[in-house]
Every structure is written in C-alpha cells, then in structure tokens.
Amino acid sequence: MENLNRKKAIKIELANPDTIRSWSHGEVLKPETINYKTLKAEKDGLFDERIFGPTKNYECVCGRYKKANPMNKGKKCEKCGVELTESIVRRERMGHIELEEPVTHIWMLKVAPYRIAAILDLKAKELEEVVYFVSHIVLEQGNQSHFLEKEVLDLGSSRITKTREKLQLSILDVIDQINDPEHRDTKKANRLLEELKNTSIPFSIDEATSLISKYTNAKFGIGARAVEYLLEKVDLTKEIEAIKIQLENSKKTPNERTKLLKRLETFDSLKRSKQRPEWMVMRVIPVIPPDIRPIIQLDGGRFTTSEINDLYRRIIIRNERLKKVKEMGAPSIIVNNEKRMLQEAVDALFDNERKPKPVQGKNKRPLKSLTSVLKGKQGRFRQNLLGKRVDYSARSVIAIGPDLKMYQAGLPREMAITLFKPFVIQWLQDHEYAENVKIAEKMLLQNDPKVWEALEQVIKDRPVLLNRAPTLHRLGIQAFEPKLVKGKAIRLHPLVTTAFNADFDGDQMAVHVPITKEAVAESRALMLGSSAILGPKDGKAIVTPGQDIILGNYYLTTEEKNAKGQGMIFSSLDEAFMAYNSGQIHLNSLIGIALSALPEEKFSDKNQRLNSYLLTTVGKLYFNQIFDDNFPWINSNNIWNAKEAVKEFIYDFSQDIDKVIENVQVQQPIKKKELSLIIERYFETHGARKTAEMLDKMKDLGFSFSTKSGTTISAGDVVAFTHKYDEFKEADQKVEQITDFYNMGMLTNSEKKRRIIDVWSEVKDKIQNELATVLRKDVKNPIFVMVDSGARGNVSNFTQLVGMRGLMNDTKGDIKEIPIKSSFREGLTVSEYFVSTHGARKGMADIALKTADSGYLTRRLVDVSQEIVVVNEDCEPTKGFEVSAIIDTKHDNVIVPLKDRLVGRFTFEDIYDDDKNLVASANTLIDKNIAEKIIMSGISSVIIRSVLTCDNKRGVCQKCYGLNLATASVVNIGEPVGVIAAQSIGEPGTQLTMRNFHTGGVAGNVDITQGLPRIKELLDVTTPKGAVAIISEVDGVVSEIEDYNGVFVINIVTENEEVKKYKTEFNSVLRVEQGSSVMAGQKLTEGAIDLHQLLEFGGIQDVQNYILKEVQKVYRLQGIEISDKYIEIIIKQMLNKVKITDSGDSDLLPGEIITIQNYKEVVQDCIVKSIRPPLSKAQIFGIKKAPLESSSWLSSASFQDTARVLTRAIIKGKEDKLEGLKENIMLGNLIPAGTGLTGTQEVEQLAEQYHNNEY
C-alpha cells in the first residue's frame, strides 16, 4: 500500500508580498518579547499569543480559559483574542513585519552570480552603492541626453569629477529651457552651477536631481525603492529576445558571451517559473514561528534567547524609528540614513556573515542569522534533518565476549531494562502481573523478580543494533540478539571486531533498539552479525580470526615427532579423545585413526575404509570436528586441494606405522593465511549462516587450546645476537669512505645521503635475514610461534627487539642517515631515543590529519553517488566496456590482473578464443571458473557490462553492476550501490599515505604524488601537482624530436601532413621516440595527465580508463584491493553531464548543463519532431563540484555552498522530485532503496525463517 503521508516533491521559489501576508497570522508591531514580571508574551510583540497561538494547550493568556479543554478547540478568547488550540501551532504559525521602506534580499544582491545586478545589467559594486544610499541611479532618461537610463551617479572620489560635469551640462540645459534670468529656479540653478564648478564646495545631489527632473521628466532614485522601480520595468520576453540577438553576434569576446549567457539563464528561469524580478525586493518580511527561536529560562532567573530574536528586534526598532523620522519631516540625509540602517538590519537577519561588518553579540561574535542556521555541520540540514539523535539508545565501553555466538551481543542488565522498559511493561500487563502502567513501573523500581523474567522473554524477539563511531562502511552498524550479562560493559563477539574496527582498549559502542515490526525483520534478515562474513569492498572474508584464535589452532594442528603416544592406532574418534584426555598421548603426537571411524562423505572408497588408517594427530581430529561432513578433511596446509592432498596420509594396515612416521616429513601447522582460505572456501560451499556456525566452533577451539598451549613471552625468549657488531664495523668504514668522497666534491649532498641510507638498509636487511634463520631453528620459541602463525608481530619487530632499530624518519618524513644501532633488548641511548621519537610524533600527527581528510573524502563520495540504486534487472545497453589487465606501463608490472577485473561481472557479448570456440555467451555472470577459462584461452581483453555504459535514466541495472561482493550473489533490486561504492573507496582512505614522494632532484625521475593527495587530485579533477604530462592533441606519427639542452620539441605529423609541435619542460622524461605512432590523448612525456585536457583531446572513454587505472594504482600500491565497479560508479557520476554549446531549435539554453540521459531524450524528441537538435560538449566535474550540479536542490544545499545553491534553485523555481536518498531522509520519507523500494514482505518472511533457526 502506498504511504499517503509520503511527500512526492518539494518546490522552492521567491515569495511575493501577498504570499508572505497569506502565511502570516498577524503583524508584529513591537520589539518586545516577554514581560519581565509576568513572563507572559507581550501584546503585538515577537511572541504574541494572539499571532502565534497559545503557549499552553487550550489556554488563553488572560486566564479566562484556564483548564485545558479540547472541546474549546478553534474558539477565540473574547477578552484577549487568543485562539484556543494546541501549543504545537507555535512551531508552525508565522507572523510578518510591514516595512516602511522596501529592502533588497541580500542573497539576490550579494551571492554570486549577483542576480539583481545581472537582471539590470549593472556592476555588482555599483548596485550595492545604490542600495546602501551612496549613489543615485537614473530611473527614467526623460528628455535630457547627458544621463542614460540605469546610469549610476557615482560620487566616489575617483569619478565624482565626471558626475559634476554631467550635472553642470544638465543644469545648463535647464537654464536654457526656463529662459528667464529672474525665475527663482534659474537663480537656484546658477547657485548649483557655482557649487558644482568649485570642487572644494559641497553640493546637494538631491537638489540637483530634483531640479533636473522638474524640467526634463528624467527620474532619479536611490536605495532599494529605486532598484524595485527598475525591476518592475523589466520585460522578461523582450530581454530574452534581445540577448539571443546579441549572442548571434560573433564579434563578442568569450567574457562578454559568458556574461550574456548568465543573464539569459536568469531571465529564462524567471519566465519559466512565472516569477517577477521585483519580488527580490521585499516590502514585507516573514517572522518565523516563536518555538523555532525560543526564549529559555536558565537557573537563577536569567534568560537566554535565540539570536534571531535580537535580529528581528533590531528590524522592528529601526522600522518604527524610520516611521517617526518620516512623520517629523526630517532632512533627506537623516531619512536616507535610517533607510540604510533598516536595509542593513534586514541583511543581518537573512545573512549576517555576508555583511562587511556583521552584527555582533555581547561576546563579540557575529549573531547567527537565518543562513547560518541552515548551513554548515551545525546547520539545520546536517544537524537536524540528515541525522537526528535517537531515542531507545544506550552507550557503554565494550569488552570481549568469548562465550557469545556470532549473532549475539552481551547487554548489561541495567542497560537492557532501561532500553526495553516499554516492552517489559507491556509484557507484565499482558501476562496479568500488573494491572496498569503505574503498577508495572513500580515493579521495575522495586526490582521485582518478575521484571527479569519479562526482560528475558522480551529480548528473545528483539535484536539490537550495535554501532561504533566512526561508521566508515555499512558493517559499522550490525544487529545482534541481546544476551543479558553482569557488569556495565557491552560484550562483543571477538570475530566481529574487524568489521567495526574495534579493540578492547576503552572503545565505546552505541546500542539502538529497532521498534517496528519491519525494522525488526530487516535487522534480523539483513543486518545480523552472523551474516556479515564478507567485506563489501573486495568480497574477501572480513571475519578472519586473529591473535589467540590463530595461536590455538596453530598449536592444535602442529605435528611433533617422538612425542608421547606416537604410533598408536585408534579404531574410533572417542577412543583417541579418551586416550588424550587421560594423558596417554600428546596433542601433537603422530597417530593413526582407522578410516572407518571417519565420515563416509570425506572418505568414500569402501575398500580403503576397511583396510586403511589416516596418519594424523589428536589436534587435527579436534580441528576437523568443526567442519561439516561434506567439507574435505584438512590434514595439511594445502587447502585448495585438500581432498586430493589428504590421500598421501592414508596407509594400509599392513604398513608398520612406526616406519611410516620415521619416513614422513612433519607437516606445517595451519596458519592465519590458511584459516582465511578455509573460511572463504567454506563460505562458497555452505553460505553465510553455516560459516558463522563453523567460525564459532573455530573460535572456541582457538581460545581453548591457546590457553592450554601456555604460550607466553619472557626476556629469555629473546635470544642475544652479538654478530651484528661485525656488520656495524664494516658499514662504518663504508660510510666514512662515502663521506670522504663527498668532502672531495665527487658526490652531491643528495647522492651522499642516498648512498649512506643504502649502506644501512643493507645492514639491517642482513641482520634481519640472519635473525629469521636463528628464530626458525627453535620452532618452540613462543616468539617464533606467534610470528610464524600470523597471530602477532613479524620478523621486523623481532629485529628491533634483538638486532637494531635501523633508520628512522625525521619530522618531514624523510629518512635520517644516522641509524639506531641498539636494539630494544639492550636499550637505546638518550640520543637514539630522541631520534626515534621524531618519526613517531610525525606518525601521530599524520594519522590525525589523515582521519579528517579521509572522512571528508568519504562524505563527498557519498554525496556524489548517493542517488545510484539498482532499479531493474536489465537495461539492454547498446555498448559494453572493454577491460584488460591494468598495467603500469612505466615499470611494466601488473597492477590489477584481468581475472580480478572479470570475476563477478556479466559479459556484454559472446566471447570466443582464437579457434572460434565459444568460451562464454553474452549476459553470462563470470565466476572464477569462467574467468580462468578466458585467461587460459589467451584472451587479453574482454567487453563486459559496466555501470559506465548502463542505459538506465536513473540508477543502474543488475546486469551492469554484477555481483554483490558482500553476499557473493547477484545484486538485489533496491541495493543502494552508490553509497556502498562511496564507503568502499572512503573506508580504506585512512590507510593511504599522506606523503608526496620526492626523489631529491635526481635527474630522470619525476616527483609523484601518491596516497590520499593523489586520490583527491584525481577525484576533485584539479591540475596535478608536480610534473604534468604533455598529451598529444592529434593522431599521427612522431617525425622528429629536437633536443635543445634538455628541452625537447616533439614534432607529430598527422594524416593530412600537418605538423603539430610540442615543447617540453627542462629535463622531461619522454614516453615516445622518433617513428612512434601516437593517438590523440596519449602521453608524450612522463607525469600526471590533466583530466580536462584528456577529455578534450582523448574523449570520455580515455578519461574513464585513466581515472580507473590511477585510482587502482594508488590503492593496490598500499595493498588495498577495491573492486573496479565502485570506482566506475564514482566516474559515472563525474562524467554524466554535458554542456549545451548550441541549443538548435530546442528549449535548452546555450551554456546550460544537463545530464547525458536528459540530453539524449531532448535530441530524440527533436529528431521525432524533425527540428534541429541541440549540440553539446562532454563535461567532467570533480566530486566537490558534482553534488552541487545535482538535479536535487535539497541534496546540493545540504552539501556545501548552501546560500548559492538555494539562490539558484529559487530563481529557477526548482522542483525536487525526491529521487535520491538524502532528500527523502530530510523529509522523513522512507528512502527509495532496499525495502523502501521493494517492500518488506520478502524480508519479513526471511526474518521469520531465521528466527526459527539458531544461525
């Protein structure tokens, strides 16, 4: 059923004076707020109850109607005139102030592109002078020729002479017209002439203009009233025609054309939205409802008020004062000053910060105006509409919950009783333990035992959501079934910590309670912790066990020769476990187990089962217990081929086990990498729920046996290593030699530094390799066990403990040439300690900056892609997207192999190998096997379906998107893939480096920007820092390369025999040689490409491929895998607009920017009507600019540049169709994604099914 409360669209436009009066419930006449004695609202004041409604439900202000009686609704009190209704109306009822003098709206005057100035074709500065009573303006030319219409009479020091001259000429004309020397006006004119001629004497401009007006019908004005007069005269249709004629004039400069197009857009927008320009000048202003600008009583009888009230008070006071001044007949200079002050007071109300001198409060800080209330992080949009504080929530420190199942979280009892209070009360009433709410609440206060029973029952059906800030990706909020625990800490399952990026060193988490039936169903079906096995960014398992769990399973699967009970053969599992539990055999002893005792699904050969045994350990028997019977037996670390690998451990009973053990090699234990593979393989064959069940068993085994292994570290485990001093001696000699060379002038400073660093790096590597060898000799050394298993630490840590710390970074992040020779075991000297703190401190500062930078990147990415949702199954596109392995051509190494780019995507067309055999047909989902097949066929590039070529008008289709990496199945309709893409690119942002690598001026190398700065450079489409590559503008052949002492001139000959010359920077690295064929858009020199140039010369596809390759390069260099499809979504949004260059016979305007889909529709329409279609040029917008070009003004305004976006939307009278997610969140609608698009029926059925099963 359709929700009738759902808002369909929202429109914004200029309000005319009558509209403002129609909103109002009364005029505010006095600046007073509330009476200081009675604390009641003053009559006709800013809080008047007659205008805005009663402060208490159904009670009037005079006390005649005291008892709140809903029966009186709609009545007005006969005495005080207050309407009796709910006090909530004070949040919606508006008032108004009738202004004594019109004022301009500051947004229309001062927000670029200065709308009023554009309409009147004036300079913004000149117009401001008119509005703020500095300069007069000509309203009507009359029958004089010295002043043109709309000319500003500038009395500023630079141009006052010219104005004086013109006034003199006009006055001389007046004298000629009067033609009577004795006339009083002639005498006045002569006096004025004298004043104007003598620059040292001041003159009255009012007197001069009124005299000229009297005899020439010319009209002069000043202030907003003059602007209003001119705006009323504007004929939109005539202006549009005139501008179009001017645009046809080819002699116009680009700047003039841009200015004309801006004006044309303004006039066209106003005409289409049926708005009048004079509405930009206000004669009446609305007063917002009082509960939105409240007065609050503080302790001690003092009051605090919203700053907007102060701004309204100033307006009312100045308005009243202007009335009085006018009534008194004061001189024009005083009246104009009052008018200017009124204009400034209204400016301060609308946008105080835009004023040159903002109105300040007592604390010398600008008062918050209506614009300030809207914009920024603390503004209405981001603080109150896009995110709100939520009821039924709690927060506490997290602690580990080793006994929890993967779908559970431990909630402290006191927290749970408060969170579920309403449900507990309901349960007590339903089961007749309490007759009403009051009794139930009393039972809660007294800790009645029945309350705890009620709580236990209530939480069975109600999952809770756990969230850890910062929520960088969708796994930052997951649902769990609550389990009541003692203490005050929330207990978290150890395996979900990776997804939350949580650890137990004091992190806090928030708990939220889903309330409605649909919310509960969604939590259980879509968000349960046990279903989040794979990470969305790369489809790899995110619940990989760590630390103790790895250690326990490593110990469990270790094999040891000559341990207690070696060579025993058991007929059943129980027998083996009993022997272990009674101390007969060691956990790691090699033993035999009859195949008949093991599951038939794993060992199906009947003959073998009767006559053979498996060589294994008790530990491995325990380990294999955690898997299903149809999962292969794991007996070695060959996981992918476990079924075949296990066969080499099966022996016939006729073979003597002791001899067998003597001849076999000890197998490596299961390490972190193997555990990850097992989880991935298990997920592929068994799905999420079963994998979660297996993981819980793996966790229990790991904890149990890591405890039994008793692995600890002591100083004794850290072996002494004295051999290093010989290495140091040799290195010191080499360094001395290098320094001597430098002193003799044979090396530059940077070369000396590089060589010294190389020497010490070599020493550290040598020591590290030797230590690794030493460490491997003692496989029982706890440090070796931890490093080898992948539980914690690595060889480099160990080197620092025993060998040397090595080279450190300085505060700039560059490497220092003096190494730290001591190890932590020996202890550092004071100077060494000081050196080592430098880099550490920089690391901390970097992380802090990086976190903020990465967070802002994510926010911009979300804003640019949030409207992309999977809307249908197949868009049937006309073209595909060609992919091949991404190769770094400079170093000739593969960044992303073709297989990674194919898995999880759909083919666009049939794929054949060289022998014309069909490898995969069109519209087939490419899985690992098909991808392997394609690569084995020797195919190097494949055309696939991509979001970049998806033909949907909005959103994407299932086939162009492909696999949902988080579920390893085809993406569902309604999936908000745009937001997931943004999170997947933004979430690893904190792991990217902040550094720009400098090569220290070594010739032949190019400084490269990497890490986060490079990502920002690409996605913001800014000119690259460092070396910018020269790209060819034409197709052709390099005919000659001229070398002028390191500056090259590259000559390219095109097919038409034209020669194009490119001059390089000094010492540029060339990418072409004589005779090379080049394509338009191809690099001629090393460096980063300017994307605007590439779009112009290479085209859209080149830009798409370049951004994709470069972004992947940055992430892969840091070892972060991100799926192509996420980057493609962002690129799609950056390139989905075109600029109209010629409007043809369509309604589009030249210079207008629209989406490619809309453009295609208009062209199609023109072709059908047989009229000239518009022409366009592709545009690229960075992720900072793209959201501002969004079709939704609500979404754009809440992103950045609120005032500018809203001004533009107002002029266009824009309607927001509420197609994206943000707009709907703001208006309280369900978002058009997920169940908001497809309904909740399916999810509710799923939830029911999951509720009945344990996992």
Curated annotation (Swiss-Prot):
<keyword id="KW-0548">Nucleotidyltransferase</keyword>
<comment type="similarity">
    <text>Belongs to the RNA polymerase beta' chain family.</text>
</comment>
<comment type="function">
    <text>DNA-dependent RNA polymerase catalyzes the transcription of DNA into RNA using the four ribonucleoside triphosphates as substrates.</text>
</comment>
<comment type="subunit">
    <text>The RNAP catalytic core consists of 2 alpha, 1 beta, 1 beta' and 1 omega subunit. When a sigma factor is associated with the core the holoenzyme is formed, which can initiate transcription.</text>
</comment>
<feature type="binding site">
    <location>
        <position position="507"/>
    </location>
    <ligand>
        <name>Mg(2+)</name>
    </ligand>
</feature>
<feature type="binding site">
    <location>
        <position position="503"/>
    </location>
    <ligand>
        <name>Mg(2+)</name>
    </ligand>
</feature>
<dbReference type="GO" id="GO:0000287">
    <property type="term" value="F:magnesium ion binding"/>
</dbReference>
<dbReference type="InterPro" id="IPR012754">
    <property type="entry name" value="DNA-dir_RpoC_beta_prime_bact"/>
</dbReference>
<dbReference type="GO" id="GO:0006351">
    <property type="term" value="P:DNA-templated transcription"/>
</dbReference>
<dbReference type="InterPro" id="IPR042102">
    <property type="entry name" value="RNA_pol_Rpb1_3_sf"/>
</dbReference>
<dbReference type="InterPro" id="IPR038120">
    <property type="entry name" value="Rpb1_funnel_sf"/>
</dbReference>
<keyword id="KW-0804">Transcription</keyword>
<feature type="binding site">
    <location>
        <position position="62"/>
    </location>
    <ligand>
        <name>Zn(2+) 1</name>
    </ligand>
</feature>
<keyword id="KW-0808">Transferase</keyword>
<feature type="binding site">
    <location>
        <position position="77"/>
    </location>
    <ligand>
        <name>Zn(2+) 1</name>
    </ligand>
</feature>
<dbReference type="InterPro" id="IPR007080">
    <property type="entry name" value="RNA_pol_Rpb1_1"/>
</dbReference>
<feature type="binding site">
    <location>
        <position position="960"/>
    </location>
    <ligand>
        <name>Zn(2+) 2</name>
    </ligand>
</feature>
<keyword id="KW-0240">DNA-directed RNA polymerase</keyword>
<dbReference type="InterPro" id="IPR000722">
    <property type="entry name" value="RNA_pol_asu"/>
</dbReference>
<feature type="binding site">
    <location>
        <position position="957"/>
    </location>
    <ligand>
        <name>Zn(2+) 2</name>
    </ligand>
</feature>
<dbReference type="InterPro" id="IPR007066">
    <property type="entry name" value="RNA_pol_Rpb1_3"/>
</dbReference>
<dbReference type="InterPro" id="IPR007083">
    <property type="entry name" value="RNA_pol_Rpb1_4"/>
</dbReference>
<dbReference type="InterPro" id="IPR007081">
    <property type="entry name" value="RNA_pol_Rpb1_5"/>
</dbReference>
<dbReference type="Pfam" id="PF04983">
    <property type="entry name" value="RNA_pol_Rpb1_3"/>
</dbReference>
<keyword id="KW-0479">Metal-binding</keyword>
<feature type="binding site">
    <location>
        <position position="505"/>
    </location>
    <ligand>
        <name>Mg(2+)</name>
    </ligand>
</feature>
<keyword id="KW-0460">Magnesium</keyword>
<feature type="binding site">
    <location>
        <position position="875"/>
    </location>
    <ligand>
        <name>Zn(2+) 2</name>
    </ligand>
</feature>
<feature type="binding site">
    <location>
        <position position="950"/>
    </location>
    <ligand>
        <name>Zn(2+) 2</name>
    </ligand>
</feature>
<dbReference type="GO" id="GO:0008270">
    <property type="term" value="F:zinc ion binding"/>
</dbReference>
<feature type="binding site">
    <location>
        <position position="60"/>
    </location>
    <ligand>
        <name>Zn(2+) 1</name>
    </ligand>
</feature>
<dbReference type="Pfam" id="PF00623">
    <property type="entry name" value="RNA_pol_Rpb1_2"/>
</dbReference>
<dbReference type="GO" id="GO:0003899">
    <property type="term" value="F:DNA-directed RNA polymerase activity"/>
</dbReference>
<dbReference type="InterPro" id="IPR044893">
    <property type="entry name" value="RNA_pol_Rpb1_clamp_domain"/>
</dbReference>
<feature type="binding site">
    <location>
        <position position="80"/>
    </location>
    <ligand>
        <name>Zn(2+) 1</name>
    </ligand>
</feature>
<dbReference type="GO" id="GO:0003677">
    <property type="term" value="F:DNA binding"/>
</dbReference>
<protein>
    <recommendedName>
        <fullName>DNA-directed RNA polymerase subunit beta'</fullName>
        <ecNumber>2.7.7.6</ecNumber>
    </recommendedName>
</protein>
<dbReference type="Pfam" id="PF04997">
    <property type="entry name" value="RNA_pol_Rpb1_1"/>
</dbReference>
<dbReference type="GO" id="GO:0000428">
    <property type="term" value="C:DNA-directed RNA polymerase complex"/>
</dbReference>
<dbReference type="Pfam" id="PF05000">
    <property type="entry name" value="RNA_pol_Rpb1_4"/>
</dbReference>
<dbReference type="InterPro" id="IPR006592">
    <property type="entry name" value="RNA_pol_N"/>
</dbReference>
<keyword id="KW-0862">Zinc</keyword>
